[in-house]
A protein has these predicted regions:
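Functionally engaged cysteine thiol sites
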Residues: 8, 13, 81-87
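Alpha-helix C-terminal capping/helix-to-coil transition sites in glycosyltransferase folds
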Residues: 71-73
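Phosphate-binding/catalytic loops
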Residues: 76, 82-131
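Structural motif
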Residues: 68-69, 86
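Conserved active-site segments centered on acidic
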Residues: 1-67
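Short alpha-helix boundary/capping motifs
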Residues: 50, 79-80
């Protein structure tokens, strides 16, 4: 199983949704985790609502730091716009998905970020499948 860690600043929006999509679409190919460089402690209610709209329940998830997930090394570490604030985590391959933080966006714009994350997770799965 391919291990992947999604990292953003608060682990309350982008990385949570990426982990959720990896679980939804991964068909057991991925072991996904998510964390934040400065976790907020909670998942944004907007993210919970946005993911509920596509059939995933984030309501029981919580925001966590890198120290709360397995130490790796991971096959993939995907950072999401946290720049220099992203902690170093050992990985075979690293990528930065420069995605805007949707935290304060209106639902239509928030959902655009959600949909972009889903698209990128699906592309990552295609890479893993092509392996």
């Amino acid at each position: 199983m391919t291990t992947v860690l999604f990292v953003c600043t608060e682990n309350s929006n982008r990385s949570q949704m990426a982990e959720a999509f990896a679980r939804m679409h991964g068909d057991g190919l991925l072991e996904p985790h998510s964390a934040g460089s400065r976790p907020s402690g909670t998942v944004n209610p907007r993210a919970v609502k946005a993911m509920a709209e596509v059939g995933y329940d984030l309501s029981t998830h919580h925001s966590k730091s890198v120290s709360e997930v397995p130490t790796g090394p991971y096959e993939f570490v995907i950072t999401m716009g946290c720049g220099d604030a992203c902690p170093f985590v050992p990985a075979v391959e690293r990528d930065d998905w420069d995605l805007a933080d949707p935290r304060d966006l209106a639902p239509p714009e928030f959902n655009q970020v959600r949909d972009e994350i889903e698209s990128r997770v699906k592309a990552l799965l295609e890479r893993v499948n092509a392996g």
